[in-house]
A protein has these predicted regions:
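Short, surface-exposed terminal/edge motifs of secreted or surface/virion proteins that either
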Residues: 37-62
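Extracellular/surface-exposed low-complexity repeats and stalk/linker segments enriched in Gly/Pro
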Residues: 1-42
Length: 62
């Protein structure tokens, strides 16, 4: 499972992928050291991932 470990004031959610399957299901350029935002709209939850320290502003939705 993806465990939420911290929610910082700007809304970024830090997570830990605790099972290998979770890591395998993430896009190849996303690591377990990434930050994650949960965006819920119209009943759907979208996980937005960004590598820690990535200043490009590029988020990957899964």
């Amino acid at each position: 499972m993806i465990k939420i470990i911290n929610v910082n004031p700007n809304g970024v959610i830090e997570y830990s992928a605790t099972e290998q399957a979770d890591i395998a299901n993430l896009p190849k350029n996303v690591e377990s050291t990434s930050t994650c935002q949960l965006i819920t709209a119209a009943g759907l939850t979208v996980y937005m991932f960004q590598k820690t320290g990535d200043k490009t502003g590029n988020w990957i939705a899964i």
